[in-house]
Curated annotation (Swiss-Prot):
Plays a major role in antagonizing the type I IFN-mediated antiviral response by degrading or inhibiting multiple cellular factors required for either IFN induction or response pathways. Acts cooperatively with NS2 to repress activation and nuclear translocation of host IFN-regulatory factor IRF3. Also disrupts the association of IRF3 with CREBBP. Interacts with host mitochondrial-associated membrane (MAM) MAVS and prevents the interaction with RIGI. Interacts with TRIM25 to suppress TRIM25-mediated RIGI ubiquitination and thereby RIGI-MAVS interaction. GO terms for cellular component: host cell mitochondrion; host cell nucleus. GO terms for biological process: symbiont-mediated perturbation of host apoptosis; symbiont-mediated suppression of host adaptive immune response; symbiont-mediated suppression of host cytoplasmic pattern recognition receptor signaling pathway via inhibition of IRF3 activity; symbiont-mediated suppression of host cytoplasmic pattern recognition receptor signaling pathway via inhibition of IRF7 activity; symbiont-mediated suppression of host cytoplasmic pattern recognition receptor signaling pathway via inhibition of MAVS activity; symbiont-mediated suppression of host cytoplasmic pattern recognition receptor signaling pathway via inhibition of RIG-I activity; symbiont-mediated suppression of host cytoplasmic pattern recognition receptor signaling pathway via inhibition of TBK1 activity; symbiont-mediated suppression of host JAK-STAT cascade via inhibition of STAT2 activity. The gene is 1C. The lineage of its organism: Viruses, Riboviria, Orthornavirae, Negarnaviricota, Haploviricotina. This is Non-structural protein 1. It comes from Ovine respiratory syncytial virus (strain WSU 83-1578) (ORSV). Belongs to the pneumovirus non-structural protein 1 family.
Length: 136
């Protein structure tokens, strides 16, 4: 099987509704199943919201493989709790240019998002986040 190795995937996040909203998400996790990790990422749901000037980002997946909240690292981003009652802001619908090279995944992965919440849904989501984070 081989031992677990530290793997890093860098993903370019682009909001298809606003091309200026681009950020790099660096996912660092211990796994020896890089292909499964890539597929997990492609099927995951990304939560992101700006609350009181802070952008919260979290990848939600039911897979046993990373990513989980404790391995997400990105400049200008922080992780947030998973909402137990569901709901999302962006759904990851496409993951391209990710492949293995000498046991590593190419770091020029590109991600495209769709599914924007309405203002009322966003307000409700923001309220839930405020409660979870103790900001109310």
């Amino acid at each position: 099987m081989g031992s677990e190795t530290l793997s890093v995937i860098q993903v370019r996040l682009q909001n298809i509704y606003d091309n200026d909203k681009v950020a790099l998400l660096k996912i660092t996790c211990n796994t020896n199943r890089l292909i499964l990790l890539t597929h997990t990422l492609a099927k995951s749901v990304i939560h992101t919201i700006k609350l009181n000037g802070t952008v919260f980002l979290h990848i939600v997946t039911s897979s046993d493989f990373c990513p989980t909240s404790d391995i997400i690292e990105s400049a200008n981003f922080t992780t947030m709790p998973v909402l137990q009652n569901g709901g999302y802001i962006w759904e990851l619908i496409e993951l391209t240019h990710c492949f293995q090279t000498n046991g590593l995944i190419d770091d020029n992965c590109e991600v495209t998002f769709s599914k924007r919440l309405s203002d009322s849904e966003l307000e409700k989501y923001s309220s839930q986040l405020s409660d979870l984070l103790g900001l109310n």
